[in-house]
Amino acid sequence: MRKTSTYGLCLALASLAAPASAQTNVPGDPYVNDPVGIVADPCPPGRTIDNSGGWQMWNLHLLTRDFGQLCRYRADNARLAASGAAVRVVFIGDSITDSWIGADPAFFTGGLVDRGISGQTTPQMLVRFRQDVLALRPAAVHIMAGTNDIGGSTGAATIETVEGNIATMAELAKAHGIKVIIASIPPAAAFRWSPQTRPVPQIAALNRRLADYARRNGFTYVDYHPVLATPAGAMKPGLASDGVHPTPAGYAAMRPVALAAIAKTLGGR
């Protein structure tokens, strides 16, 4: 028994050690020369990180070099801080937030700042919350997250974990004097990238929990479903390009709802 246990322990240790080497040295990895470990500047100069090397290599890059994608907005944050411009609301989220500024650039004026990153889950947003939200010292933060957690983009998670990640972001904001707006997870009947997932009941369950959490903690809850969703929980026809990501018409429907939530949260600020 002891011999077997020792062998098993060695095997386990080997399996833990091996990926650390394998994940940073893979043939064909376009990011092989990117910095790793504790360095003065983790963001490679002179190029933009993207998924041109293929989805598998992009996932490898995220897992081993920039899980929270801190490099994405690092330069933008520095420019914003140097400008001295007041930040009213930071919008943090996934591709639905990331694409919002492209569909409605006029919305992100007057101190509204987009910090969405396509594909992100709540643990990834937590990693960058200090840099992309707290450090900008906004009056409020709009948190819209959970779609990719339900789709399994970074593995499995319980509904409690996803709610907890959003709650942690909200409570960090509150501790720094930042007002909190928690958004509903937008409607979706299916995910193209995760065809086995049936998201409607999970979205509904998480939104109930988020609405209750916001109410109990005095945060604003903004629900986009009345303007986006069908009675069955899908996106209304014409409001999403793929049943998930809003079209310009979808964002136009969201705009007054978001502005009302900001007015409720900040008043005249």
List where the protein language model places each region:
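Short linear Ser/Thr-Pro motifs
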Residues: S15-A18, S95, S184
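Alpha-helical cap/lid subdomain in secreted, periplasmic
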Residues: P105-G111, L126-R269
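N-terminal secretory targeting modules
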Residues: M1-V90, G102, F107, L136, ...
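Catalytic nucleophile-elbow at a beta strand-turn-alpha helix junction centered on a G-D-S/GDSL motif
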Residues: A86-G102, S118-T121
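Hydrophobic residues at beta-strand termini and immediately following loops
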Residues: I92, R115, V222-Y224
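A short beta-strand-loop structural module common to alpha/beta enzyme folds
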Residues: G111-Q124
